[in-house]
Regions:
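N-terminal membrane topogenic signal
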Residues: 1-11
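Membrane-interface capping segments at transmembrane-helix boundaries
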Residues: 168-185
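Hydrophobic cores of alpha-helical transmembrane segments in multi-pass inner/ER membrane proteins
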Residues: 38-48, 89-101, 153-171
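Membrane-interface transmembrane-helix boundary segments in multi-pass integral membrane proteins
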Residues: 128-168
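Aromatic-anchored segments of alpha-helical transmembrane domains
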Residues: 13-22, 61-73, 114-125
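Membrane-interface helix caps and helix-loop-helix hairpins in membrane proteins
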Residues: 22-29, 72-82, 101-102
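Membrane-helix exit/interface motif
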Residues: 45-49, 53, 66-76, 97
């Protein structure tokens, strides 16, 4: 079976985001600022515009933070919705398809990590502390008693994410070595 074209996957991601946003009431629409949802939007932009490196940046944000955070939340709360499952799994499928098609580009880790770090800071200043989007106001509930204040928690999260992003980069590079070599050695 032939994989869907990038534009179709981009539109599917936009549709999933719209569906999930529609499921939020006014008090919880800020939850759409969680990095996983922003990463989905970044992936959609990359897929629709044909910017592979942008799509890859969104994908590594999902692999390194979004999916792990979502799975931990589902495990802790025993609660999710159909739109949440869709908006978390569809980007993974689209990312895998596109990375298999075009390989894994170089230079994705540090820009993605900086984006994550700046996004969390912006959420600290713009979101309701009660919702704690991206743990911008404190550590995740189940481990809050082990962490220091918000800034120590943020620094620890940022360091963990940097390691996770580098590990994902190594794995994705190895899994797509032949395509990545072809991508980087092809004439412009």
């Amino acid at each position: 079976m032939k994989p869907p074209p990038p534009w179709a996957m981009g539109l599917a991601l936009v549709g999933a985001l719209a569906l999930h946003t529609a499921s939020k009431d006014a008090a919880h629409v800020q939850e759409m600022l969680w990095l996983c949802h922003v990463a989905t939007a970044v992936m959609a932009i990359g897929l629709l515009a044909g910017w592979h490196r942008v799509m890859a940046g969104g994908f590594i944000l999902h692999v390194g933070f979004g999916t792990v955070g979502w799975l931990l939340d589902v495990a802790a709360t025993h609660d999710t919705t159909v739109s949440s499952v869709l908006v978390h799994l569809l980007p993974l499928a689209a990312g895998v398809i596109e990375v298999r098609r075009k390989g894994w580009p170089r230079g994705v880790v540090l820009p993605s990590w900086l984006f994550y770090s700046l996004w969390v800071l912006s959420c600290h200043w713009t979101t309701d502390p009660a919702i704690n989007v991206n743990m911008a106001h404190g550590a995740w509930g189940p481990i809050e008693h082990w962490m220091g204040g918000v800034w120590l928690s943020g620094a620890i999260n940022s360091a963990i994410l940097l390691v996770t992003f580098f590990a994902a980069d190594v794995v994705l590079r190895r899994l797509t070595r032949s395509r990545s070599v072809a991508l980087h050695s092809a004439p412009s």
